[in-house]
Amino acid sequence: MSAFTPASEVLLRHSDDFESARVLFAGDLQDDLPARLDTAASRAHTQQFHHWQVLNRQMGDNVRFSLVAEAADVADCDTLIYYWPKNKPEAQFQLMNLLSLLPVGIDIFVVGENRSGVRSAEQMLAEYAPLNKIDSARRCGLYHGRLEKQPTFDAEAFWGEYALDNLTIKTLPGVFSRDGLDVGSQLLLSTLEPHTKGKVLDVGCGAGVLAAVLASHSPKVRLTLCDVSAPAVEASRATLAANGFAGDVFASNVFSEVNGRFDMIISNPPFHDGLQTSLEAAQALIRGAVRHLNSGGELRIVANAFLPYPQVLDETFGFHEVIAQTGRFKVYRTIMTRQAKK
């Protein structure tokens, strides 16, 4: 990761401000500026496992991946650089968490693309750290303020839930389909047969809805769930627990932390990373599935109909079929056979 995002390029216009600062980087860390910016000391906290992977190679223990930051993660920092995400409740969770730990008087810089809604940072932090806009470039805004009052933070207050048939789905800010079942997942679920058996892996599990519905009508299924997002991992664990289902849930960048083979891999793969369109995760899912499927095992994914996945499926497995579709979505199915490229 070498190219800087527009938000980082705006920060670099103010690099002199950070040379003697002890900086905590947090939020939507899309590049490795936290490892490369000239500071007195740098730490980073992220809820995204793939961002942690990149930064950990350069920052070691000075970057931490978790749902909630702790006091040790912000120790000795006198400056917060926060990259605004596209999701306002996610920003609220992260900023209230961080500012409840950081000392009064620290410098706060909030940066983000205008289309992300970064201007709402002013209203969100008005009670705790009044912000002023100090730069505008690359279609981004940069805001600065000082912490005048620590907020109280209760992670439990951010939990939500919704009912799906007889199931309870637990959610957190930043989790895909936080407010209800999305149309793509609904289409994929319509193709899953009752009494499915064997080992099933849900990649990009979100709130755990695919796995929970599958377990509800296939009690003998053995579930493994993974996601890059710490909120998604915790939400999936909570969803399984709320409905009395067992499953192994952990953070993974597609297959990076996955061991073993499965009888079925299911996914509603993301095609955005933050605000940016990215097909990398879905392509890595398709190409990597051959190393994690048993012979005769099945990959079943749902995707927007316009995305170019049929070619990757055919290149990797030798064939694919569309087993359900609407005007917007298609469910693709393929099987692990001898012609698959291992």
UniProtKB/Swiss-Prot annotation:
A cellular component annotation (GO) from this entry: cytoplasm
- Its main subcellular localisation, reduced to a broad class, is cytoplasm
Q: Which InterPro entries match?
A: DNA_methylase_N6_adenine_CS (IPR002052), Mtase_sm_N (IPR013675), rRNA_ssu_MeTfrase_C (IPR023543), RsmC/RlmG (IPR046977), SAM-dependent_MTases_sf (IPR029063), Small_mtfrase_dom (IPR007848)
| MF GO annotations | 16S rRNA (guanine(1207)-N(2))-methyltransferase activity; nucleic acid binding
Keywords, comma-separated and alphabetical: Cytoplasm, Methyltransferase, rRNA processing, S-adenosyl-L-methionine, Transferase
EC annotation from Swiss-Prot or TrEMBL:
2.1.1.172
Listed under catalytic activity are: guanosine(1207) in 16S rRNA + S-adenosyl-L-methionine = N(2)-methylguanosine(1207) in 16S rRNA + S-adenosyl-L-homocysteine + H(+)
State the compartments where it is located: Cytoplasm
What the protein does? Specifically methylates the guanine in position 1207 of 16S rRNA in the 30S particle.
> Partners and quaternary state?
Monomer.
Output the PANTHER family linked to this UniProt entry: RIBOSOMAL RNA SMALL SUBUNIT METHYLTRANSFERASE C
NCBIfam families noted in UniProt: PRK09489.1
Which family does the record assign?
A: Belongs to the methyltransferase superfamily. RsmC family.
The protein here is known as Ribosomal RNA small subunit methyltransferase C
**Gene coding for it:** rsmC
